[in-house]
Amino acid sequence: MPARPASSTTRQGALAEDRALAYLQRQGLVAVERNYRCKGGEIDLIMRAADDTLVFVEVRKRGGRGFGGAAASITLTKQRRVLRAASHYLATLDRLPPCRVDVVALDPGRLEWLRNAFDLGALDSEGGGEGPAS
């Protein structure tokens, strides 16, 4: 059976990730992995900074700036998924490097790099659960 063509949303997301990756590389970060997935989470980009910090990057794109723009679209549930995937990835390493979670937010005509966008320590306080269903 032939593979289904990627949806417009999937293509737009991949283009946003390409743009974020190129931008971060120009800033001196080195790509480690792209689209890391595990049960319960995913990370768009994993990068390494010059100081050896491992940087987990969530890329968000919005077609308009309504409702707070791309950065504001990162829900608590999405943060938990990124943190879960980061924890899973870190468990595969022999040594734990310094790490942080950044966001690259793409709005029309604007790219914003938010360093330390949310705290990896939140994993410890959340207990890994999703919380009550809404």
Curated annotation (Swiss-Prot):
GO terms for molecular function: nucleic acid binding. It comes from the Bacteria. Belongs to the UPF0102 family. HAMAP family: UPF0102 (MF_00048). This is UPF0102 protein Rmet_3430. It comes from Cupriavidus metallidurans (strain ATCC 43123 / DSM 2839 / NBRC 102507 / CH34) (Ralstonia metallidurans).
